[in-house]
Design a protein with these regions (language model features):
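Donor nucleotide-sugar binding/catalytic pocket of nucleotide-sugar-dependent glycosyltransferases
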Residues: 126-167, 177
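Membrane-proximal helix-turn-helix segments that form the acceptor-binding/catalytic region
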Residues: 99-102, 106-141
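Nucleotide-sugar-dependent
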Residues: 257-282, 286, 294-302
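Conserved donor-binding/catalytic core segment of Leloir-type glycosyltransferases
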Residues: 5, 167-199, 205-209
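Nucleotide-activated donor-binding/catalytic signature segment of Leloir-type glycosyltransferases, i.e.
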Residues: 219-254
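Glycosyltransferase donor-sugar binding loop
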Residues: 205-219, 238
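Short N-terminal targeting/anchoring amphipathic segment
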Residues: 5-6, 59-79, 92-93
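A charged, aromatic-enriched C-terminal amphipathic alpha-helix characteristic of glycosyltransferases
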Residues: 306-348
Length: 348
């Protein structure tokens, strides 16, 4: 059996969970997981080998283990540590922000003083910020989780599969907008305005499935007072628990994902679907849901539907249509593809 180490000591617990889920029951690989406490506390595990780690421990932990491949889930900090790993081992790095991954030193210096200055100075002075692009360059492979972002330089790693559960049977239509409620990521002003001026007679519940705060929370509180009787909204002022997320995603008839075309990471512009993946893509696959995206979003996937002018009619129509997610995204099929890619990375 081939031995893999998966490291996540920074941010993306949901990606670590997806990797753990798809590798569960594999016959050809054993995987050791190295997580920070923050990540470990968010992970649901069975009998996987999970080790508590951080940037000061990880190099010693990897020593003499004989791993065939090391996968680093996020390289957004601890650059000096990760550079040492990529120099010493056969490493694959998951790239989440492609423009950040190739940023020049000058780009990074400019970015340090634009926002979060104290934190970014810490990355510069203590964590090797200027090695960031070198970590990606030195890594044996760069991985992306959205096929549309793959190229000769970036290898697509399929992780998301559709879970087995019964289709939603709601008396009233349930539209879920998954993700943290932030105008930077999705156009919530447009959503609020559309819901407020909706002219549908059909009962409908809109669920904002992510933590709302600041101005967005105030807008939701105001909106909840102005709705017609047939429209309801559900929102959360605290972090959404895994149980609540699961419950509402299963209950959803359709996902509404009006993501912004552009966002920023480390004050560098990233474009959704081109240099940055949206987590809503994985949500749609995992729960087997139609997802309505902005008309300009670059996707060839059949279950990603470009938004039409009358979005509320469109959402209603989609609740009556079927897409066979299990045919294309069942766990056996996705696991097989993932294993083939891992074998290729090991034999490079």
């Amino acid at each position: 059996m081939k031995k893999i180490a998966y490291i996540e000591i920074d941010t993306h617990a949901e990606i670590a969970q997806a990797f753990m889920d798809i590798m569960r029951d594999t016959k050809d690989f054993t995987v050791d997981y190295y997580f920070s406490k923050k990540i470990k506390d968010q992970i649901s595990k069975n009998d996987e080998a999970v080790f508590l780690s951080d940037s000061s421990m990880i190099l010693d932990q990897l020593k003499d283990k004989g791993y065939d491949l090391i996968i680093i889930g996020t390289v957004h900090r601890f650059f000096n540590t990760f550079l040492a790993i990529t120099k010493k081992y056969n490493t694959a790095v998951i790239a989440h922000n492609l423009n950040f991954s190739k940023a020049s030193k000058l780009d990074l210096v400019k970015s340090v003083f634009k926002k979060d200055v104290i934190y970014r100075l810490k990355l510069w002075l203590k964590e090797g910020l200027f090695y960031s692009s070198k970590v990606y360059q030195t890594s044996g492979t760069l991985l992306v989780l959205d096929k549309a972002m793959s190229s000769e330089k970036y290898q697509f790693l399929p992780l998301f599969y559709t879970k087995d559960y019964r289709a939603a049977e709601n008396q009233d239509r349930v539209v879920v907008i998954p993700g943290g409620v932030s105008q930077k990521r999705r156009d919530y002003r447009y959503i609020f305005k559309t819901i407020q001026h909706s002219e549908t007679n059909k009962p409908c519940e809109f669920v904002f499935l992510g933590k709302a705060k600041d101005s967005e929370l105030k807008e939701l509180e105001k909106l909840s007072q102005k709705l017609p009787e047939n429209i309801r909204i559900t929102y959360f002022s605290e972090r959404v628990s895994a149980e609540d997320f699961e419950k509402w995603m299963q209950k959803a008839d359709v996902l509404w994902c009006p993501i912004q075309e552009h966002t920023e990471f480390f004050s560098l512009k990233e474009t959704y679907g081109v240099t940055k993946m949206t987590g809503n893509l994985g949500d749609a696959v995992a729960y087997g849901k139609w997802a309505v995206f902005p008309s300009g979003y670059p996707s060839k996937l059949d279950f990603i539907i470009p938004e039409k002018e009358n979005i509320l009619n469109q959402l209603n129509e989609l609740t009556h249509l079927h897409f066979d997610f299990q045919k294309y995204y069942n766990k056996i099929e996705i696991q097989k593809k993932t294993e083939q890619i891992l074998f290729r990375l090991i034999s490079k």
